[in-house]
Amino acid sequence: MSEAQKMDTPEQAAFRAHCQEWLANNLPGRPTVKLPLGALELSDPNALAWLQEWQKSAYDAGLIGCDYPREVGGGGRENCQSIANTEMQRAQTPYLPNIIGMGMAAPTVFFHGRDEVKAELLPKLLSGEEIWCQGFSEPGAGSDLANQQTFAERDGDNWVINGHKVWTSLAHFAEWMILLCRTSKDDKYNGLSYFVVPIEKALGNGVTVRPLI
């Protein structure tokens, strides 16, 4: 028994046993397509689909989104995601494709989004059914976020966003983007806002995605 296991609460110990049993019986076979080294290098839609199927099965088994409340698609547990991650790593499972969604979008949406937004976005994010990308870097500015030029302007109840983003990994597969842009030009270090943008629905209607490599 590892030191971590010795510190498990009864609930965590039961959950760890569930993870171990499920993984022992449900690991996928050899990939039917060639997979790149990591999710951010995905370019083959068939590889993405294979990995999405794996993420959905792990999500349905309760190994992903464990610590989020049930009402937003989570498992309703406490301090259990790290246990699932450890057991998946030990079992040498495939990587999860929706890493930007899970690592960057989900926490922000959960802690800052309205209840109806969380209920709409988080279940399919955690299951991997909807892929997310990030829109931070820009031509000429790279990752210098203070030099953002993409601008969002109010138009009644809507926002109109104009600009360009680069190195938007997974954008060619994504339904959603977490987008950082300027809503005020008064101060270089202020006036930055964070948007959730449905880029797939806007393709050909103001949004263009072009792979660089």
Region spans (language model):
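Residue-level signal for inorganic ion chemistry
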Residues: 12, 114, 195
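Conserved protein kinase catalytic domain
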Residues: 85, 106-109, 122, 196
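Active-site glycine-centered loops adjacent to acidic/histidine catalytic or metal-binding residues
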Residues: 69, 114, 163
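Amphipathic, small/basic residue-rich leader segments at the start of a protein or domain
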Residues: 1-99, 120, 124-127
